[in-house]
Swiss-Prot record:
SUPFAM superfamilies: Ribonuclease H-like (SSF53098). It comes from Paraburkholderia xenovorans (strain LB400). The gene is rnhB. A divalent metal cation binds at residues 35-36, 128. This is Ribonuclease HII. Manganese or magnesium. Binds 1 divalent metal ion per monomer in the absence of substrate. May bind a second metal ion after substrate binding. Its EC number is 3.1.26.4.
Length: 248
């Protein structure tokens, strides 16, 4: 990057997310914030984003955990983040990677891809949660970081908006599941559609409700080997299906 105004948007395949804020550990640190969206859904990829802000520029107002924002507000902030970030990258891990690695390792992969895809190399990466992927730079896990560290908040917004848009595209191809309404989460509507139609190729067959529907109806798509993820209520609400502030 030759200047802060150089295009710095990058979207890559794969998974692992990290975020870092502006409370630099040292004056010379380049801090990156990372977060993910889509651990709990029964369908679609897990998406991660990494964001670096320029500490010399005013901070964007209204940044917060994506779960407390309406869809309209997230879209507005998304545009501001990609316009004003010093660097950012959005990455994902596919359904196939989730099923082969498990959702935790796929999430770490998406985060790692997001950090490594940045056009500016950070010296410190702050990641929402209690785990960090293996990186070549310093990293720090921040529990509740999406509400505490502005660059993590920004990453949570980029990841959430990007994934929601992906699921809208999947809805166009597979309208019977209602991906436009629940973004792949295990709502009663989605579970009923799974029971009636069985899973499509975008469903995570390592997740118990999908596996059960597959075994009940059969879809011609092989089941993955390994452990089955039992979806809990916590997973169903892990990263913003239904904003805390109400439906957007």
């Amino acid at each position: 990057m030759t200047s802060a105004r150089t295009p710095r948007r990058k979207t890559v395949a794969g998974a692992s997310a990290q975020q870092v804020g502006l409370n630099f550990e040292t004056p010379d640190d380049i801090v990156c914030g990372v977060d993910e969206a889509g651990r709990g859904p029964l369908a679609g990829p897990v998406v991660a984003a990494a964001v670096i802000f320029d500490p010399a520029k005013p901070m964007i107002r209204g940044l917060d955990d994506s779960k407390v924002l309406t869809a309209k507000k997230r879209d507005e902030l998304y545009d501001k983040i990609v316009d004003r970030a010093l660097a950012y990258c959005i990455a994902s891990a596919s359904v196939e990677e989730i099923d082969s690695l498990n959702i935790l390792h796929a999430t770490m992969l998406a985060m790692k891809r997001a950090v490594e895809g940045l056009s500016v190399v950070p010296t410190l990466v702050k990641i929402d949660g209690n785990r960090c992927p293996t990186l070549s730079v310093r990293s720090e896990a921040v529990i509740g970081g999406d509400a505490l560290v502005k660059s993590i908040s920004a990453a949570s917004i980029l990841a959430k908006v990007t994934r929601d848009r992906m699921l809208l595209e999947l809805h166009q191809a597979h309208p019977v599941y209602g991906f436009n309404a629940h973004a792949g989460y295990g709502t009663p509507q989605h579970l009923a559609a799974l029971r009636e139609h069985g899973p499509c190729e975008h469903h995570r067959r390592s997740f118990a409700p999908v596996r059960e529907a597959h075994l009940r109806l059969g879809t011609g798509v092989p089941l993955p080997a390994g452990n089955v993820i039992v979806v809990s209520e916590v997973m169903l609400d892990d990263d913003a299906f239904g904003e805390r502030s109400g439906a957007a």
